Amino acid sequence: MPGASRFRGLALGIISLGALAADQFSKHAVETHTAVGSLRVVIPGLLNLVHTSNPGVAFGLFADSENPWRGPLLITFSVAVIAMLVWLLATGRAGGRLGECGLALILGGALGKVLDRFLRHSVTDFIDCHIGDHHWYTFNLADSAIVLGAALVVLELFREQAHPNQEPA
């Protein structure tokens, strides 16, 4: 049904663009209203807003690298991942609805990351989750979209494994 697949594509596009918009809006708000390094306690002992700039990759890896190719390589890799995600979604190879929604969220998060690297040469992180003095790495909404998307893809894989002869939803 062409109408159904067009609607599905539109819905997945809205999910991706929604994740991208939420990510970029939140980063703009943090960059506009807080100084780099500033800390705001949101929930004592659990959640802070900390404005940081990460020129590296996940968990700050390669942030201290002086290699002039770091930025272009990260952008090139990100664009390749984005192209693969678009191809998977466009060709219907994402599995069922959970897998498609998951890949759409990952796509939105990846777009947010590559846009940051292209425009700012770094990624703005600001969410600091912790329990007492035990802090997780600071992250942003693009990271959240990618992690949530990956969880949905894994759930889709479990669903497919539990019902191998069932058509993807």
Describe the predicted segments one by one.
Residues M1-A169:
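Alpha-helical transmembrane bundles and membrane-interface segments of multipass inner-membrane proteins
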